[in-house]
Amino acid sequence: MATGMGTQTVLQVSGLSTIYPTPRGNVEAVRGVDLALDEGDVLAIVGESGCGKSACLLSIMRLVPHPGRVIAGSVMFQGRDLMKLGARDMREVRGRDIAMVFQDPMTTLNPAFRVGDQIAESLRVHGLLPGFPASLARRSRAREREMVTELMRQVGIPSPETRHLEYPHQFSGGMQQRILIAIALACKPRVLLADEPTTALDVTIQAQVLELMREINETTGTAIVLVTHDLAIAAEFCREVAVMYAGQIVEQGPIDAVLEDPVHPYTRGLLRSIPRLGERKPLTPIMGEVPDLAALGPGCSFAPRCEARRPCCDISQPELVAVDGRRLVRCHARRD
Amino acid sequence: MRALRDSPICLEGIEAIDEGRRAAPPWEAVRPEVVREARAARSGSVGGSGPLGLAQRNLLSFGRQMAGHPAAVVGGVVILLYVMAAAFAPWVVPCAPDEVALSQRLTAPSWTGAFPLGTDQLGRDILSRIIFGARVSILVGILTIAISVTVGVGLGVVAGYFRGPFDRLVSRFTDLLLAFPYLIFVIGAMAVMGPGFWNLIWALSFKGWVEFYRLARAEVMSEKTREYVEAARALGRSNAAIICGEILPNVVHSILVLGTLRMGNMIVLESSLSFLGLGIPPRTPAWGSMVNDGRRYMLTAWWVATLPGLALVVLVLAINLVGEALRDVLDPRLKEG
């Protein structure tokens, strides 16, 4: 997309749509999302709770929980459409080519196993370490410990030689998230999908974890998609940002352009509702409520809350079109 | 505590712990070099931090925690005595259990006499019959629980993980089984099949698995919503690997606790059936049928009915004490950090 680095595209998402059937009708969680991720890209997806950010990542991984399902779209990765892969081939891709980091490290680590074993397991799943019973051989155990401690060292866990024997509850939240990142990085994935990886952590730890992810991105070229509701994190960490609202991308472009000069009224509203240190102005929230995704009207889904609303907004969906050459905006009232 | 520490199973690991304790009391925090030294000292044993080393240490930590429950230690010793006596019954009994000595009928217990616990109405030695009766009770307990756990957990894990029509079908069937009172159900089954050891096992297991099914299903359903399962899927693990490698280890403790507690129930049920003459055939000594034999002599020869009953009470109590302690130790919510 707009990185201009001329590198090759690793992940190309087009027209991705996901629904969750409910008694009230189908909740359209993701509605025609297009994304392109180049090697080494860092893309943020921002938006309110329930706007489809996480559903979007889960759809890419084909992990949408039952009864939800992806109804349309393609995810091209290394010349293959992930949506058309068989279950076994898809398992091969998960973890090895595309890895995921989840929001709450405490519950994402299995409480019954030592962290070293959990890291080793991620290597075993994709054959980087021999599985049972070969894993019991003295030599493969030594190799396992070597690889595990090396990964733990890479993600900055002090004294990994001792700590790989500990259980998840013996680690702090930040250290747990580092272990999860170690697990995600074990197979050297091309793409890392991070679903609010710092939400459960306090601010200083957030910065450390983000710094770690940035380092990984710079040294290995792993492309990262970071889902967050925190614009400050997106601004700090990413080069490109996609703002989601009601399952659609409403504005996408280089982070500086979007944050300094937002075009879409929703992005403007989001920026106005962030408290700033030293400013004593009252915050301006976005009025109204997130629309019911099970009962969307024909018009723009942001129209009922929009300050720049026009008559046509209630009648037809705006398209995502290029504005000032650098970004895409989905709004009837955009400047061209 | 002492008794457990001196047992040969734990000795190896205890050395490592005691080595480590000088540096840091909680054994999880034992410095690795200390452990390595201790390990190196026992030549020929597993080195490194592989699965075997971990299993040993886990067992050890478990043993130490169980030792903190004196009642459980007593219960464990009692169970061990019963099992040993039952296993070596032909060698430890003073008389053959079916040796009839009509001249000695209804002899009172006496430590000095030939019959320490007295004789029954046919002059058979009660101690010998109790020891042989332990074989029946323990075997019934172990076999019924083994069958119930295998069937119940197997079906419950599949139903809880995949849900769908299979879950609905099996769950409705268990509802049906639960609608029958247990004892009436087993009495009916035994009346149809007739007394016999294996008939008894099948009759008890036929309904025994239901509780394990429900427990396993509920536990798997709640574990399945945890994020680590989603993370395992995102890592590319298959359903079978997730069930066996991620979920079962988090569920196994509650199954172990229920299994222990239910084993006591099964033994009581077996005795109830034998008491009614529906369980073990009369020639084989069983505690329930012994109590029934002694019923008529309750006022003149109390020991004939009371002592086998006491043997039953002590064994079931011991099993329940161990079960309670297992629950305390294995429940992760109560586990120390």
Task: Locate predicted features.
Chain A
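A short, flexible loop at the N-terminus of ABC-type nucleotide-binding domains that lies
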Residues: G6-V10, I19-G32, L63-R69, G86-D89, ...
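Conserved ABC ATPase "signature" region
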Residues: R80-D81, G127, S135-T162, L271
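A short, proline-enriched helix->beta-strand linker immediately N-terminal to the Walker B motif
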Residues: A186-R190
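Conserved ABC transporter NBD signature motif
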Residues: V70-D81
